[in-house]
Amino acid sequence: MTIATERYSRSQANFAAAQAVIPGGVNSPVRAFRGVGGSPIFFERGQGAHIWDVDGNRYIDYVLSWGPLLLGHAHPAVVNAIATQAQRGTSFGAPTELETDLARLVLDLVPSIEQIRFVNSGTEATMSALRLARAATGRRLIVKFNGCYHGHADMLLVQAGSGVATLGLPDSPGVPPTVAADTITIEYNDLDAAADLFARRGSEIAAVIVEPIAANMGFVLPKPGFLSGLRELTQQHGAIFILDEVMTGFRVAPGGAQALWNLDPDLTCLGKVIGGGLPVGAYAGKRHLMQLVAPAGPMYQAGTLSGNPLAMIAGLTTLRTAFTDDNTAFQRAVTLTTRLANGLRELGERYRIPLQVGNVGTMFGCYFLRHADAQITNYVEAKANADTQRYARFFWAMADRGIYLAPSQFEAGFVSTAHTDADIDQTLTAVEEAFAQL
């Protein structure tokens, strides 16, 4: 693999400087480009669907800060709302009307949610949701799925996806065995394994937590009946069903994957889009569960910056802008995502490059496969069948052509309302050129 080092010379210098003062030179592991080789690209600005690196190179962006930027970079309405609020105050550590306004809007969009608590990250959301599930049931065991990533809380760093998958780690040192022992992992899409587990230990299980689309081990769709089957198992055994929609929330549909696939979870975890590009998370769900959260109930959770007005106004403006006028802007982004995914499939067939392409709403994923007859429906298959070396060559071929994709095959891609047909045309032209040289 040849990387045009002169094109990224300032990024390389920045990375060398960062490594002296930041562990690994980055503040989140996947950003280190271990999944594609070379040095990470350093960016300095973004506008709409485009970003510019420190060397002055312009890219069409399909990472979008790992999903939050549904409207694209620096959307005028969001920027103006943040600027106006910043002049009024950035944080009060006290209630504001913005929290209630955003809460009401989320409840309007997601039918299963009756109450919501805002936090500062997706990790806080999942960690708090699991604590709430244990408080509600009096049980300790958590069930998660291999390759699904729910943040970096100790109990969830067991066979996780995202950066953990990119680095090839089974789990993380520093997680006590006693904590890991309370987390049981099974393969994604294996409803029989879940049923067997509940048959043996159902009375001990506090919660099942699952990504509706396993987008932290690439892009794995649920098999028909998998998610609804999990819901039935939790209901039968008195466990809490937690749908982690930190990534899929407001991305695959206005009401998330649960609205798209008619699911009714007990608790939902949200993040990314509801902060409009600022740090945010939320856990939400049925009133009888949320009423256990302090100060209404005994389950303690708190945060200095939780519900801060900058994140609230950014999220509120993003959702109001995306889901107005019969969701026209959002649906147009869905159409562009479908066109991009179909183009990838067609070009893969034309150049005889084995691919597994998936897309739902404004999310997509593209696996390069080791064999034409390979498939990926879970983490075992992702590790065995994904051709990461070929993806790395593809990543840099696309970057050299001004297209920025996730620097890991085990991450999803995103389209924004700022993307255009011309962006898709340029992207598919670059894909064809890249495929021709792979």
Curated annotation (Swiss-Prot):
<keyword id="KW-0663">Pyridoxal phosphate</keyword>
<comment type="subunit">
    <text>Homodimer.</text>
</comment>
<keyword id="KW-0413">Isomerase</keyword>
<keyword id="KW-0963">Cytoplasm</keyword>
<comment type="similarity">
    <text>Belongs to the class-III pyridoxal-phosphate-dependent aminotransferase family. HemL subfamily.</text>
</comment>
<dbReference type="InterPro" id="IPR005814">
    <property type="entry name" value="Aminotrans_3"/>
</dbReference>
<dbReference type="InterPro" id="IPR015421">
    <property type="entry name" value="PyrdxlP-dep_Trfase_major"/>
</dbReference>
<dbReference type="GO" id="GO:0042286">
    <property type="term" value="F:glutamate-1-semialdehyde 2,1-aminomutase activity"/>
</dbReference>
<protein>
    <recommendedName>
        <fullName>Glutamate-1-semialdehyde 2,1-aminomutase</fullName>
        <ecNumber>5.4.3.8</ecNumber>
    </recommendedName>
</protein>
<dbReference type="Pfam" id="PF00202">
    <property type="entry name" value="Aminotran_3"/>
</dbReference>
<dbReference type="GO" id="GO:0006782">
    <property type="term" value="P:protoporphyrinogen IX biosynthetic process"/>
</dbReference>
<dbReference type="GO" id="GO:0008483">
    <property type="term" value="F:transaminase activity"/>
</dbReference>
<dbReference type="InterPro" id="IPR015424">
    <property type="entry name" value="PyrdxlP-dep_Trfase"/>
</dbReference>
<dbReference type="InterPro" id="IPR004639">
    <property type="entry name" value="4pyrrol_synth_GluAld_NH2Trfase"/>
</dbReference>
<comment type="pathway">
    <text>Porphyrin-containing compound metabolism; chlorophyll biosynthesis.</text>
</comment>
<dbReference type="GO" id="GO:0005737">
    <property type="term" value="C:cytoplasm"/>
</dbReference>
<dbReference type="InterPro" id="IPR015422">
    <property type="entry name" value="PyrdxlP-dep_Trfase_small"/>
</dbReference>
<keyword id="KW-0627">Porphyrin biosynthesis</keyword>
<keyword id="KW-0149">Chlorophyll biosynthesis</keyword>
<dbReference type="GO" id="GO:0030170">
    <property type="term" value="F:pyridoxal phosphate binding"/>
</dbReference>
<dbReference type="InterPro" id="IPR049704">
    <property type="entry name" value="Aminotrans_3_PPA_site"/>
</dbReference>
<dbReference type="GO" id="GO:0015995">
    <property type="term" value="P:chlorophyll biosynthetic process"/>
</dbReference>
<comment type="pathway">
    <text>Porphyrin-containing compound metabolism; protoporphyrin-IX biosynthesis; 5-aminolevulinate from L-glutamyl-tRNA(Glu): step 2/2.</text>
</comment>
<feature type="modified residue" description="N6-(pyridoxal phosphate)lysine">
    <location>
        <position position="272"/>
    </location>
</feature>
